[in-house]
Amino acid sequence: INRTEETISQHFYWQNMQNDITKSVSTCAICQKQKKQRRKYGHLPEKEAEFRPWERLCVDLIGPYNIKSKIQGVKIPTLKCVTMIDPATGWFEVSQYDDKKSITVANIIEQQWLTWYPHPLLITLDRGSEFIGQEFCEMCENDYGIKRKVISTCNPQANAIVERVHQTLGNLIRSFELQENPYLDQDDPWSGILAATAFAVRSTYHTTLRAMPGQLVFGRDMILNIQHLADWTAIKAHKQDLIRKNNRIENAKRIPYQYKVGDQVMLENHQANKYEQPYKGPYLIQKVNTNGSVRLRMVAVT
């Protein structure tokens, strides 16, 4: 707006020129579709800290990891994994998979989690075909009565705990020299690496939890026979403080705005490359949810 006003004022002037330019630029549909905004609109609501163990399960896929061997002629197989985590305790499981078929992933989660631990009420996952396939949906809803919560690929923060575990997992995996460890199975070196990595995650102190995941699950230390009594009230309060702090930091970057039914909004096109139109729309808001999200009528307003 300022640059447009400065450019026009070099040659022209009229009464209420500033207001006219501001209104024209602010309501220009072409400008809003083509120019990418750095700041997002609307403050994010504060989430409630999770502190009930085994109530929710977060799952995702990680990989493929490809590591080149330093030994000539030795090829290290590609690593592809399913990761599972209880966000309340931080307890973590990881298992390799051969393909991304819905039935394959469903069997892994059933065998590596649902037959080992208390059944969750809710499972959080993304929109990958392996998670929305018929076999996976039937396992969750028909076999175990678990409600699925599908997050948007545009909002990975909704499954942020999994992303943090993936980062830790990647760091630990890269720290191993597979080909130089004589104790690893040369045909399947990843099985030993994943077992050691999972133990490292479970037995490491988490600042958010103020404990090790293993301590919260078993009530004792993972290495020494030392009892651990979890204060879930204090854990919840600490988690909520961190959520509140991060929420303030995130909202400080956003433009305050209260969405209303009937508003017209642009929808960001996350698949667009840098030369394509970054926004689509405008679309009409049909409903504003209590968590700050909105439901759109997916027919562009003309």
Language model regions located:
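Structured nucleic-acid-interacting core domains from mobile-element enzymes and related host factors
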Residues: 39-58
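Conserved short alpha-helical interface segments
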Residues: 14-32
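Active-site beta-loop-alpha junctions of metal-dependent nucleic acid enzymes
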Residues: 77, 94-116
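Reverse-transcribing Pol proteins
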Residues: 1-10
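Conserved hydrophobic/aromatic pocket- or pore-lining residues that grip, position, or stack substrates
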Residues: 21, 60, 90, 109, ...
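Short catalytic-loop micro-motif centered on adjacent basic/acidic residues
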Residues: 95-96, 122-126
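Domain-scale segment recognizer with a strong primary affinity
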Residues: 26-28, 35-38, 56-58, 120, ...
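An active-site-proximal beta-strand-loop segment
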Residues: 53-93, 98, 271-272
